[in-house]
Design a protein with these regions (language model features):
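Single conserved hydrophobic/aromatic residue that forms the stacking wall/gate
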Residues: 1-16
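General detector of N-terminal leader/presequence modules that precede the first folded domain
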Residues: 14-84
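Phosphate-rich cofactor/ligand-interacting catalytic cores and adjacent structured alpha/beta frameworks
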Residues: 173-238, 244-245, 269, 282-396, ...
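Short, conserved charged micro-motifs
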Residues: 62-63, 106-113, 289-292
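Conserved phosphate/anionic-ligand binding catalytic regions in large, soluble enzymes, centered on
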Residues: 262-283, 402-417
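Cys/His-clustered metal-coordination modules, chiefly Zn-binding fingers
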Residues: 125-178
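A broadly conserved sequence feature marking short terminus-proximal activation segments
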Residues: 87-139
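C-terminal structured interaction module
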Residues: 162, 166, 398-427
């Protein structure tokens, strides 16, 4: 169910804190600078050049939503075209830009760019100009479609059929809708990547079901799929400036959907709490600016602690996921750094050695938590190439002891999401 009602997302630009109105002269100067740089890159590399800018009508060309759309577009280009010979990003008040050079035929690059522009709504805001090694700009086989009516954009533009206000409103809607869907897809993928990672001690993975008799990988995948629409709405509510109470209400709906999908099994309750906070915070920062981790901490502090849960039963013995949230997710952020240097298994083991994991306390008491932390600390001292085999041994041990570091697994999923989303690139 769409909880936004009549609120909508069309006014998110109006609440953005750091937007700057630019002049026509600035736009023309930026275009001249871009052309000069294109010539320099053509002379240096001699390959096919791709110039990526955003079609944003009106005097405000740069905003977090615009930067997120371009950042996601670059990721799509990497998937569709492979890695370029050269890439450079330019962040300016006239809007984000990217220049890329490919060792591929220009018609091949243009064909894939056209597919990207037509694949989803946000592609209609992409301006992907392809230049041959000789400097010739490849033209489109047919005119682009109007954002408002779907007709040829050249006809509507010449006649000024729709007016700037309507075009800007439609652009805002496209960007906001894309952002919510994009972040939701990344969150779902992170949950699925976490459960598929193998071997994980005491946790469900491709090797076994860990210390759990009521869960397996397909169940976790169903759970992630059930949560995905709610992830989208958390991001949307954040952009719309929702209150903590509204977010909490949506959280209850999401939990019911998860339990319906799993037959009553709690697969992702802790992860749902963390992802709901972070997605809401990212949405708010897309609309208003700010730091997403500070924003998530403020939202978490405004929400009353849950009662009658595993987490509340052990909260007096360890801070649990709520303490992580009100602190701005420091563990997940550190784990993201480990992902870049050593990989997800090392990040998981590091968390197991440090985290006050409420799942472990619930299952094994303080002694169980201390045991897992000590064993994980021992694994951190091993050469990385020996880690998988050592993890399999620890997996067998924790299965026998019925210990599952579920809190560490949830934060690994959050770290995987942060790596994929890279909010520092667009906030």
């Amino acid at each position: 169910r769409d909880v936004l009602g009549s609120r909508g997302l069309g006014d998110v630009y109006k609440r953005q804190m750091h937007t700057v109105e630019i002049t026509l002269e600035q736009v023309l100067l930026a275009r001249d600078r871009r052309v000069l740089r294109q010539r320099e890159l053509a002379a240096r590399y001699g390959g096919t050049l791709l110039s990526f800018t955003m079609n944003i009508a009106g005097p405000v060309k740069d905003a977090p939503l615009v930067r997120l759309a371009l950042h996601a577009g670059l990721a799509s280009l990497d998937r569709d075209l492979g890695q370029p010979l050269h890439r450079e990003l330019i962040q300016a008040p006239t809007g984000p830009e990217a220049l890329l050079v490919y060792d591929r035929p220009a018609p091949w690059v243009k064909e894939r760019c056209l597919l990207l522009e037509e694949r989803e709504a946000v592609g209609r805001l992409y301006d992907l100009d392809v230049l041959s090694p000789e400097g010739e700009k490849l033209s489109r086989p047919q005119s682009r479609r109007c954002l408002i009516c779907g007709g040829p954009v050249t006809v509507c533009s010449r006649s000024r059929a729709h007016g700037l206000a309507a075009i800007r409103a439609r652009t805002r809607d496209i960007l906001a809708d894309f952002a919510a869907g994009h972040l939701s897809a990344l969150a779902r993928q992170a949950l699925e990547d976490e459960v598929d990672l193998t071997p994980k001690p005491g946790l469900v993975d491709r090797r076994n079901t860990g210390a759990h008799d009521d869960m397996d990988r397909p169940l976790f995948h169903r759970s992630a799929g059930a949560l995905a629409p709610y992830f989208r709405q958390f991001a949307a509510l954040g952009m719309a400036g929702a209150s903590p109470r509204e977010l909490q209400s949506l959280g209850r709906q999401a939990e019911h959907a998860m339990l319906d999908a799993t037959g009553g099994v709690n697969t992702h309750k802790g992860a749902l709490y963390s992802f709901a906070l972070l997605l809401s915070a990212l949405g708010r920062c897309l609309a208003e600016g700010g730091d997403p981790f500070d924003t998530a901490a403020v939202i978490a502090a405004a929400l009353p602690p849950a009662e009658n849960t595993h987490g509340s039963a052990v909260r007096s013995q360890c801070g649990g996921v709520r303490q992580e949230a009100v602190s701005g997710f420091p563990t997940a952020r550190h784990m993201r750094g480990i992902l870049e240097s050593a990989g997800p298994l090392s990040a998981l083991v590091w968390a197991m050695s440090r985290l006050d994991d409420s799942t472990l306390v619930y299952r094994g008491g303080p002694q169980g938590l201390a045991y897992v932390r000590r064993r994980a600390a021992e694994l951190l001292r091993l050469p990385e190439e020996t880690l998988p085999l050592a993890l399999e041994s620890l997996d067998d041990d924790l299965m026998a002891r019925r210990l599952s570091p579920g809190g560490s697994a949830d934060l690994l999923a959050l770290a995987l999401f942060l790596r994929a989303a890279a909010p520092e690139a667009w906030l």
